[in-house]
Amino acid sequence: MALNIEEIIASVKEASVLELNDLVKAIEEEFGVTAAAPVAVAAAGGGAAEQTEFTVELASAGDSKIKVIKVVREITGLGLKEAKELVDNAPKALKEGVAKDEAEEIKAKLEEVGANVEVK
């Protein structure tokens, strides 16, 4: 090879924008490649965007209904009567539009006392 890498880099540094554009086109034609950014690769994952808001749903109270009612009151701030109605009428949404971390925390608290919980 007549030119070493340092000489090629020095030549590229000295070239004008038009000359560099011609160089890119010549390389694309010679090697059958394109200098375009691979945008299609990022879009190929497409589909649904990652979900950021979740709904915590009480599927059933399980065996320890009283403990579940206490935790539901703590989580939702409902009164005793409202929390009992919510638990009795399961499946019901407890909290909507919460972050993933908060939803997982709520689920863990409820499952700890025997409830069946779904995060959607």
Swiss-Prot record:
CDD domains: Ribosomal_L7_L12. GO terms for cellular component: cytosolic large ribosomal subunit. InterPro entries: Ribosomal_bL12, Ribosomal_bL12_C, Ribosomal_bL12_C/ClpS-like, Ribosomal_bL12_oligo, Ribosomal_bL12_oligo_N_sf. Keywords: Ribonucleoprotein, Ribosomal protein. GO terms for molecular function: mRNA binding; structural constituent of ribosome. Coiled coil: none annotated. It comes from the Bacteria. Signal peptide: none annotated. GO terms for biological process: translation. Forms part of the ribosomal stalk which helps the ribosome interact with GTP-bound translation factors. Is thus essential for accurate translation. PANTHER family: 39S RIBOSOMAL PROTEIN L12 (PTHR45987), LARGE RIBOSOMAL SUBUNIT PROTEIN BL12M (PTHR45987:SF4). Belongs to the bacterial ribosomal protein bL12 family. Homodimer. Part of the ribosomal stalk of the 50S ribosomal subunit. Forms a multimeric L10(L12)X complex, where L10 forms an elongated spine to which 2 to 4 L12 dimers bind in a sequential fashion. Binds GTP-bound translation factors. This is Large ribosomal subunit protein bL12. It comes from Listeria monocytogenes serotype 4a (strain HCC23). The gene is rplL.
